[in-house]
């Protein structure tokens, strides 16, 4: 784990400890942690593996994705990958670079694998159920899907505490 010191890191490590110490089927994760403001540069210089998981504060995510792909790392990025339209071209270039470098750049939005999402997709493709899809446009899409980050939610049965940056659209996104 490479991260700045603070409540996000502590919350993550506490959650890992809960998994490691639960009564039923405990995990045995051994977290090796580097804390510091230079966490990203340290991770790139040490390159302890070939996959990086990017989650947390989204302000610099497009940069972190790009730099990771350029370093030859496979990237699993939590949503959203970008929070401002200006970063779309950067993200698009990162996907192209990932292809050139033979690495994976993947959005790990777990919701896409939930049965309700899979059923929605299947039903939308069944004309006898859904009907014919109307023509849409960028300003007026035919179909929209909204994913909500709830202020209050449970993670593994424990209330998730949101850190201050979560409420800042310049860091979390809208």
Q: Could you tell me what each predicted segment is?
A:
Residues 1-73, 86-102:
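N-terminal glycine-/serine-/threonine-rich beta1-alpha1-beta2 phosphate-ribose binding loop
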Residues 55, 78, 106-108:
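A cross-family glycoside hydrolase active-site/sugar-binding cleft signature
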Residues 82-170:
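A contiguous active-site-proximal alpha/beta segment in oxidoreductase catalytic domains
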């Amino acid at each position: 784990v490479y991260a700045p010191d603070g409540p996000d890191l502590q919350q993550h490590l506490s959650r890992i400890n809960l998994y490691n110490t639960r009564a039923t089927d405990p995990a045995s994760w051994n977290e090796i942690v580097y804390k510091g403001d230079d966490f990203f540069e340290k991770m790139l210089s040490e390159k302890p593996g070939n996959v990086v998981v990017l989650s947390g504060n989204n302000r610099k995510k497009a940069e972190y994705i790009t730099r990771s792909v350029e370093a030859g790392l496979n990237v699993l990025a939590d949503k959203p990958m970008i929070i401002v339209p200006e970063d779309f071209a950067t993200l698009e270039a990162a996907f192209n670079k990932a292809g050139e470098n033979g690495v994976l750049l993947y959005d790990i939005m777990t919701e896409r694998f939930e049965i309700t999402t899979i059923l929605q997709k299947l039903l939308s493709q069944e004309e006898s159920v859904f009907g014919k899809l109307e023509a849409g446009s960028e300003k007026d899409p035919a179909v929209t899907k909204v994913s909500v980050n709830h202020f209050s939610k449970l993670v593994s049965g424990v209330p998730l505490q949101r850190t201050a940056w979560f409420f800042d659209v310049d860091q979390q996104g809208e």
